[in-house]
Amino acid sequence: AKARSVTESILVKNPNIKAVFGSNDNMALGAIQAIKDAGMKNVVVVGFDATPDAAKSILAGDMTATIAQSSYNMGALGVRHALDLANGKKIAANIDTGTELVTKKNAKKYK
C-alpha cells in the first residue's frame, strides 16, 4: 500500500515518467497499481527478488522484469568465507553471488 501511494505522488509530479525501479517486488507491484490507476501505459517497471507474484505479473504483461538473486550462492559462499575468516584467511571485499534478469522468457520457472 505504501509503494502505491508513494508512486501516486511521484506520478502527479512526473506525469511523463517512463520507468520505475522497485527496491523489491512488492514495491514494484504497488507501483504498477498506481500506474494502472493513473491510466498510464508503456511504463517500464522492474522489481528485485523474483517473487512468484512478480513472475505472475511479468507473465501477465504488467511488470517488465525482476532480478533474481542466488540464495544458494549467498548461503554457500557466506559459510565458506566465514570459515575462511575464522581460519585467519583474507577474503575479497566484494563477492558476487550472481543474479538473473527475469523476463517473459524465463518467468515461468519463478512462479
What residue spans do the PLM features occupy?
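A residue-level marker of the well-folded mature domains of exported/periplasmic proteins
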Residues: A1-K111
